[in-house]
Structure formats: C-alpha cells, structure tokens
Swiss-Prot record:
Tissue: Expressed in spleen, small intestine, peripheral blood leukocytes, and testis.
Impact after mutating residue 50 to A: Impaired double-stranded DNA (dsDNA)-binding, preventing homooligomerization
Effect of residue 244 to A: Impairs DNA binding. Impairs DNA binding
Organism: Homo sapiens
Activity regulation information from UniProt: Inactive in absence of double-stranded DNA (dsDNA). Homooligomerizes upon binding to dsDNA, dsDNA serving as an oligomerization platform. AIM2 requires large dsDNA to generate a structural template that couples dsDNA ligand-binding and homooligomerization. Homooligomerization is followed by recruitment of PYCARD/ASC to initiate speck formation (nucleation). AIM2 and PYCARD/ASC homooligomer filaments assemble bidirectionally and the recognition between AIM2 and PYCARD/ASC oligomers occurs in a head-to-tail manner.
Gene3D superfamilies: Death Domain, Fas, Nucleic acid-binding proteins
Domain notes: The pyrin domain mediates homotypic interaction with PYCARD/ASC.
Post-translational events: Degraded via selective autophagy following interaction with TRIM11.
Keyword field: Cytoplasm, DNA damage, DNA-binding, Immunity, Inflammasome, Inflammatory response, Innate immunity, Nucleus, Tumor suppressor
Function (record text): Sensor component of the AIM2 inflammasome, which mediates inflammasome activation in response to the presence of double-stranded DNA (dsDNA) in the cytosol, leading to subsequent pyroptosis. Inflammasomes are supramolecular complexes that assemble in the cytosol in response to pathogens and other damage-associated signals and play critical roles in innate immunity and inflammation. Acts as a recognition receptor (PRR): specifically recognizes and binds dsDNA in the cytosol, and mediates the formation of the inflammasome polymeric complex composed of AIM2, CASP1 and PYCARD/ASC. Also acts as a tumor suppressor independently of its role in inflammatory response. Able to suppress overt cell proliferation in enterocytes: restricts stem cell proliferation in the intestinal mucosa in an inflammasome-independent manner, contributing to a decrease in the likelihood of colorectal cancer development. AIM2 suppresses cell proliferation by inhibiting phosphorylation of AKT1 at 'Ser-473', preventing AKT1 activation and AKT-mTOR signaling pathway.
SUPFAM superfamilies: DEATH domain, HIN-2000 domain-like
Residue ranges of domain HIN-200 in the record: 138-337
Name of the featured protein: Interferon-inducible protein AIM2
Length: 343
C-alpha cells in the first residue's frame, strides 16, 4: 500500500507544479524534513520525492506536502492530493479493517487474554540508563507506534467524556462521542463510534483499549474495538502537567506555530460573527492574537453574538489563503455559551 502513497506524491503532487513552484517548495523542505539544502539544490522531482520518503516515510511525506502546498497557497493541488490520499486511506482501511468481534472474542477468556497481554507489556525489560545514546535512539525507534490499526493493548486513564451526538454520513445518521484519555507520557483525544462503551469512559477510571486506530493527533475506537476495565492493581499515574495540558485551551499564538491538520479543542471568545449561505465565520481572540473559525450554520451557531464564547471540539487547523483557520469537520461539535448580561 505504501507504493500507492509514493505514486500520488509524485504524479498528483510534484509532477503538477512548475520549476519555479518546485524551487519555492524546496525552500520549506529543509525544515519540514530535515533535508540538507545542498541535496535539494539540483534535485529533480523524482529525487526530491525519494529524499522526502527516505526521511519521513511515504504517508508522512504526502501529509507534509499537502501542508506545504497550503502554505504556498497551491490550494487546488493541495485539495487534489488530499482527495487522492483519502482514497488510498480507504483502500488501506478496507484491507486492514478488523472483523466484528465473535462470541469467542467477547468471552471472559478473551478479556483475560487481553489483560495478560497488558501484564506482559508491563513486565517487558526496560532500557538500562547506562545504554549508549545511539542504542537508546534505536530502541525508541523500535518502540515507536505507527499510525493505523493497533493490536497492542493500551492502558489509559479517562480524563473526560462528552455526551453522544448524531452526525450525518452517506449511509445515514450515526452516533458517537468524544473523550480524552492519557498515559503516563501523553494524552489523546478519542473518537468513540460505539456509544455502548459510554459507561466505560468514566473520568479517573483506568481502562484498557485494544483493536483501535491511531491517527495523527487522536485515537479512533469503533465497534470492533475492545475496551475493558483494568485490574484493581493496575495503575496509570498521569502527571498533573499532562492532565492540565489536556484540558486547557491552547493560546492562539501557539496555534499559529502548529502544523496544519492539528486537532483543536477549547473555549474561545467571539469578537465577530459573519453568516454565510451554508457556514458561519467566527473571529476569535485571546490575549495573544486573533483567528478565524469556520463552522456549520445551524440554529445554535446562528444565536452566537459578539462577546459570547464557543466551545470547539475536534476542529482542525487549516488555511484559507494566507489566513490560518479552525475548520469544522463531520465529527466536530460547537457549543455556544452566551455572555452574561450586564446588570
């Protein structure tokens, strides 16, 4: 499947820009890919694609190319490349998509097996502090988790879970809910597409997630996933700084330094509301800067006025021309919090 990503990187991406546009594209590669400028100076399109893939892998190379195209305002090309990537993503999912759980897999014995796997993971030998830096780096690379379907069990602490809501798909209406979980090292936003699991996602509860998808910035739990209560002796000691970071609203000047595609949750003050035919545009601000939000126009968002606050969940950092923008997606939610009336 990686060959498909290589193909669209070259044929849909780099082959469709002019020599002058390629030079501008190369300007950003040394930072995005950590490629020496000397190697890029005389490189043709095939050589550029090869360097990118060697440095970051085919999938990451495509995603970063989309971001650079957006940064350069090659919006049509960015859109085409994104569409082709999504087609390949769907093909990959259809190949790797796990089958629904059988009765045997849902049995207590299967649950016990998952817990045994977790116990083995916890008992795995750790890297000695006396290991050389080069060896530590190799171990870290071996242990790094790739995006996609994950069989490995993940013990986490639930930090937050929101109410289920309905969203539209080509197959009709479906239900899901958002959650936030954390390990001892990091936190994750989670899309949960099985609302029967809502009683598992209780704040401060330790659970084990298996057969889930890992994406850039979030986890996906669906009907084929397993979510179990951890054993009473299983602990996930989440540091306070991770808990705090998971729940805080990012500052706008921080968002302006993040890569396109970053998932954003938070509470923001509205400075201006502009209604469009199908969408609604909010100008947000905090004490560090300003940013636009493009949301779906509905009864709730149309009630929003200057001075109100909006709580955004699963919005995506994107670009509209030269402006950074937070954009609503199929699984995004927005809640309007009216400002208190002055007495």
């Amino acid at each position: 499947m990686e060959s498909k990503y290589k193909e669209i990187l070259l044929l849909t991406g780099l082959d469709n820009i002019t020599d002058e546009e390629l030079d501008r594209f190369k300007f950003f590669l040394s930072d995005e890919f950590n490629i020496a400028t000397g190697k890029l100076h005389t490189a043709n399109r095939i050589q550029v694609a090869t360097l990118m893939i060697q440095n970051a892998g085919a999938v990451s190379a495509v995603m970063k190319t989309i971001r650079i195209f957006q940064k350069l305002n090659y919006m049509l090309l960015a859109k085409r490349l994104q569409e082709e990537k999504e087609k390949v993503d769907k093909q990959y999912k259809s190949v790797t998509k796990p089958k629904p759980l059988s009765q045997a897999e849902m049995s207590p014995a299967a649950s016990a097996a998952i817990r045994n796997d977790v116990a083995k993971q916890r008992a795995a030998p750790k890297v000695s502090p006396h290991v050389k830096p080069e060896q530590k780096q190799m171990v870290a690379q071996q242990e790094s988790i790739r995006e996609g379907f994950q069989k490995r069990c993940l013990p986490v602490m639930v930090l937050k879970a929101k109410k289920p809501f309905t969203f539209e798909t080509q197959e009709g209406k479906q239900e899901m809910f958002h959650a936030t979980v954390a390990t001892e090292k990091e936190f994750f936003f989670v899309k949960v597409f099985n609302t029967l699991l809502k009683d598992k996602f209780i704040p401060k509860r330790i659970i084990i997630i298996a057969r889930y998808y890992r994406h850039s910035g979030f986890l996906e739990v669906n009907s084929a996933s397993r979510v179990l209560d951890a054993e009473s002796d299983q602990k996930v000691n989440v540091p306070l700084n991770i808990i705090r970071k998971a729940g805080e609203t990012p500052k706008i000047n921080t968002l302006q330094t993040q890569p396109l595609g970053t998932i954003v949750n938070g509470l923001f003050v509205v400075q201006k509301v502009t209604e469009k035919k199908k969408n609604i545009l909010f100008d947000l601000s905090d004490n560090t800067g300003k940013m636009e939000v493009l949301g779906v126009r509905n009864e709730d968002t149309m009630k929003c006025k200057e001075g109100d606050k909006v709580r955004l969940t699963f919005f995506t950092l994107s670009k509209n021309g030269e402006k950074l923008q937070l954009t609503s997606g199929v699984h995004s939610t927005i809640k309007v919090i009216k400002a208190k009336k002055k007495t």
